[in-house]
Amino acid sequence: MALTKADIAEHLFEKLGINKKDAKDLVEAFFEEIRSALEKGEQIKLSGFGNFDLRDKKERPGRNPKTGEDIPISARRVVTFRPGQKLKTRVEVGTSKAK
């Protein structure tokens, strides 16, 4: 199951008691700040959670899997996520409990 923005807004409504529209607006504003910072080339550091970074990938050779034709894969910038140690620990502990 996936956690959606609507799910996050619902949790804010239930746990903090803010109305649903404000919760939805808060979630949208949070993600818009992240998008905006990444568009500007900034790193995002969420303490206890992890970091979102931008990485430039160079052009590289590729191959069309259907035809076998060589095609270049263009250079691009990608977003990467590196989980923080606290998140890694919680996931590892949660995984061992689930077994």
UniProtKB/Swiss-Prot annotation:
GO terms for biological process: DNA recombination; positive regulation of metabolic process; regulation of DNA-templated transcription; regulation of translation. Gene3D superfamilies: IHF-like DNA-binding proteins. GO terms for molecular function: DNA binding; structural constituent of chromatin. Keywords: DNA recombination, DNA-binding, Transcription, Transcription regulation, Translation regulation. One of its GO terms (cellular component) is cytosol. NCBIfam families: himA, PRK00285.1. This protein is one of the two subunits of integration host factor, a specific DNA-binding protein that functions in genetic recombination as well as in transcriptional and translational control. Belongs to the bacterial histone-like protein family. Heterodimer of an alpha and a beta chain. This is Integration host factor subunit alpha. The gene is ihfA.
